[in-house]
């Protein structure tokens, strides 16, 4: 059995790591490179960096900090933010990123997934999906440009349909960002993640809602995800990564220490 992964997420805005609640009211939590180095030293399996306003502001993630991170850490990391061409993806990979993630650009141009997969192979192509539960229609819908509250907009896609579409086009991994749960630390959306797991044949990363070690155990055992992503519990020191991994191991979840 493959070991499950613990993935700290670093949202980047204006060169700093920030964190919001339900994609709003972001506050600065630290500097990019020191935080990345800290998490690598604390036994994180992988890191994800999101330049959260890049797509909404029509720019691309800054390569300067990508190269600095690559020099400082020895674990895989993924970068996202405004990447919408083969050339931009190649640059980020050349500067040291192991994977690139696309979200809003893929919604604007789904064929981008095919082109990236053809060029680089699916193993380094991650699709981020910002999924919002609409209580009025009891459905999960995909939103776009979520890094800027003023720019956020609805799309034509229901989450299940978009999950199937991005797999058909060749993504290698999916990060499901559950917007309603983001930053509130009340637990992952097990129902939605299990629903997506049933139609997802590539590795699935859960994002949004982690508040306790028990929440991580629940998402691995009840939703069957391959990795759990979290931000505020790690940034604020609420959960220590190595202790979390030992807890999960003690409860039957395969982990690398």
Swiss-Prot record:
Q: Under which EC number(s) is this enzyme classified? A: 4.3.2.10
Q: Where is the active site?
A: 11, 130
Which UniProt keywords are listed? Amino-acid biosynthesis, Cytoplasm, Histidine biosynthesis, Lyase
> In which pathway does this enzyme or protein participate?
Amino-acid biosynthesis; L-histidine biosynthesis; L-histidine from 5-phospho-alpha-D-ribose 1-diphosphate: step 5/9
Q: For this protein, what reaction is catalysed?
A: 5-[(5-phospho-1-deoxy-D-ribulos-1-ylimino)methylamino]-1-(5-phospho-beta-D-ribosyl)imidazole-4-carboxamide + L-glutamine = D-erythro-1-(imidazol-4-yl)glycerol 3-phosphate + 5-amino-1-(5-phospho-beta-D-ribosyl)imidazole-4-carboxamide + L-glutamate + H(+)
The entry lists its GO molecular-function terms as: imidazoleglycerol-phosphate synthase activity; lyase activity
Signal sequence segment: none
State the GO CC annotations: cytoplasm
Name the family the entry cites: Belongs to the HisA/HisF family.
Q: What does this protein do?
A: IGPS catalyzes the conversion of PRFAR and glutamine to IGP, AICAR and glutamate. The HisF subunit catalyzes the cyclization activity that produces IGP and AICAR from PRFAR using the ammonia provided by the HisH subunit.
> What does the record note on quaternary structure?
Heterodimer of HisH and HisF.
Name of this protein: Imidazole glycerol phosphate synthase subunit HisF
Query: What is the native source organism of this protein?
Result: Shewanella loihica (strain ATCC BAA-1088 / PV-4)
Q: Which gene encodes it?
A: hisF
């Amino acid at each position: 059995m493959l070991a499950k992964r613990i993935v700290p997420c670093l949202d980047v805005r204006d060169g700093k790591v920030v964190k919001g609640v339900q994609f709003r009211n972001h506050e600065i939590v630290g500097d990019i490179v020191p935080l990345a180095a800290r998490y690598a030293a604390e036994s994180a399996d992988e890191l994800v960096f999101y330049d959260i306003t890049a797509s909404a502001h029509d720019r691309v993630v800054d390569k300067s900090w990508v190269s600095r991170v690559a020099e400082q850490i020895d674990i895989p990391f993924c970068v996202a933010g405004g990447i919408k061409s083969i050339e931009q993806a190649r640059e980020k990979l050349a500067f040291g990123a192991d994977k690139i993630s696309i979200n809003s650009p893929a919604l604007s141009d789904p064929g981008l997934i095919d082109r990236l997969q053809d060029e680089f192979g699916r193993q380094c192509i991650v699709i981020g999906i910002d999924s919002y539960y609409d209580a009025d229609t009891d459905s999960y819908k995909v939103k776009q440009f979520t890094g800027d509250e003023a720019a956020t907009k609805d799309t034509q896609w229901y989450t299940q349909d978009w999950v199937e579409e991005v797999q058909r086009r060749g993504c290698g991994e999916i990060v499901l960002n559950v917007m309603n749960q983001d930053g509130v630390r009340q637990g992952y959306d097990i129902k939605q993640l299990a629903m997506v797991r049933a139609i997802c044949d590539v590795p699935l990363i859960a994002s949004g809602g982690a508040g306790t070690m028990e929440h991580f155990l629940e998402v691995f055992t009840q939703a069957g995800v391959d990795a759990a992503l979290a931000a505020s519990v790690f940034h604020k020191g609420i959960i220590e990564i190595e202790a979390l991994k030992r807890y999960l191991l003690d409860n039957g979840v395969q982990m690398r220490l």
